[in-house]
Structure formats: structure tokens, C-alpha cells
């Protein structure tokens, strides 16, 4: 099965009084429950979400934590707090950037489900300069292969291609 989005590069940034919102929408040819599991179960998240290997734990309740501990040469721990959880349709959690948070909304449709991801940031320009749109794009590009049982590794060449595309749109910094 495969996914289809309105465009292969469909990330957008909306500037708001509070900073901004990065948005993605994916139409996935998988049942909502499978997609929910892929965004909430540690072993599934590890297959597609991060650009590095990590041990992930998820306490899937409001106030619970999602903890990602890098297992590579550079130690790093990212802890997010779960703000809202309404299985299998809504997950909202903080992000590593203070004051920002992410909202995952799933909608069941006849052909699978629609995933709407919104990343609320405090500074849209900083998010653009730090290539948040590109990182989200690349993570989401790995979701369908994961759902198909064929996870793919992070591809830095694909990241560079997406970065060049989004930079032309003013939604990412240019590669240096």
C-alpha cells in the first residue's frame, strides 16, 4: 500500500500572533488504528520518526511523557509531555523547543485515514532556519514504508533535496 499527499512537498508555514504553525497532511492507505499505533507505540516510532537511533518510551496519557534517548555516539535525550490524547484520533504533546507543541489528528476515510500534523512554534523564522519543515517532511516520508512493514533508514540525500525545494519556497534555510 502507498500514501498520496496533495504534493510530494506539502509542508506549509502559517505565521501567527503566537509564532507560527507548520502543517502537513497525508492521505494514508492504512486503517486509522494502524496509523495511531505508528505514532504512539515506541517500537513503531523508532522505525520512522527520528533521524537517529533511539530508545523510546511513551506513557500515553495526559501528563505522561514521551522520552527519546539517542543510542548513537552523541548522547541526547528529548522529553515531551503529552497534553491531550483521544485514541485513535488525537495526540498532542510538547516539543523539544520550549513553548512549542505538536498536534496529530487522524480521520478515518474510506481508503484509509488522513493524518494532519500541526507543529505550533513560538518563532516561525527560527523554525524555518532550523529546517523544521524539512525534518517533518522527511520523517513523514518514512511513515508509509513503516506502515507497510518495510521501514527505511533516514536518507540525508533526500533531506538535502527537500531542503533545496523548501528553501526555494522560503520555508527552509539554504544548505551551506
Where are these regions (language model features)?
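Hydrophobic/aromatic beta-strand elements that line small-molecule binding cavities or substrate pockets
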Residues: 26, 79-84, 101-108
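Structural motif
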Residues: 18, 85-87, 109-111
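Short beta-edge strand/loop motif at the mouth of beta-sheet-based domains
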Residues: 23-24, 42-79, 88-90, 156-164
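Beta-strand/loop substructures that line and gate deep hydrophobic ligand-binding cavities in soluble
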Residues: 92-145
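Glycine-centered tight beta-turn/hairpin loop motif at sheet-sheet or coil-to-beta transitions
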Residues: 19, 73-75, 97-99
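Short, exposed beta-strand/loop patches in secreted or surface proteins that constitute
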Residues: 13-15, 57-59, 81-84, 106
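Hydrophobic ligand-binding cavity/cleft-lining segments
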Residues: 1-55
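Short, highly charged C-terminal tails/helix-capping segments
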Residues: 145-176
Amino acid at each position: 500500500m502507498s500514501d498520496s499527499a496533495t504534493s510530494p512537498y506539502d509542508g506549509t508555514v502559517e505565521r501567527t500572533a503566537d509564532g507560527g504553525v507548520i502543517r502537513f497532511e497525508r492521505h494514508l492507505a492504512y486503517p486509522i488504528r494502524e496509523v495511531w499505533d505508528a505514532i504512539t507505540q515506541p517500537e513503531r516510532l523508532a522505525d520512522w520518526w527520528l533521524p537517529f537511533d533511539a530508545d523510546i518510551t511513551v506513557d500515553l496519557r495526559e501528563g505522561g511523557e514521551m522520552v527519546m534517548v539517542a543510542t548513537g555516539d552523541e548522547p541526547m535525550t528529548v522529553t515531551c509531555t503529552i497534553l491531550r490524547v483521544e485514541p485513535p484520533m488525537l495526540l498532542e504533546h510538547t516539543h523539544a523547543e520550549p513553548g512549542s507543541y505538536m498536534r496529530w489528528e487522524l480521520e478515518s476515510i474510506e481508503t484509509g485515514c488522513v493524518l494532519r500534523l500541526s507543529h505550533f512554534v513560538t518563532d516561525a523564522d527560527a523554525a524555518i532556519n532550523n529546517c523544521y519543515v524539512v525534518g517533518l517532511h522527511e520523517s513523514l516520508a518514512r511513515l508509509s514504508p513503516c506502515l507497510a512493514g518495510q521501514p527505511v533508514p533516514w536518507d540525508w540525500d533526500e533531506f538535502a533535496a527537500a531542503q533545496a525545494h523548501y528553501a526555494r519556497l522560503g520555508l527552509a534555510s539554504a544548505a551551506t
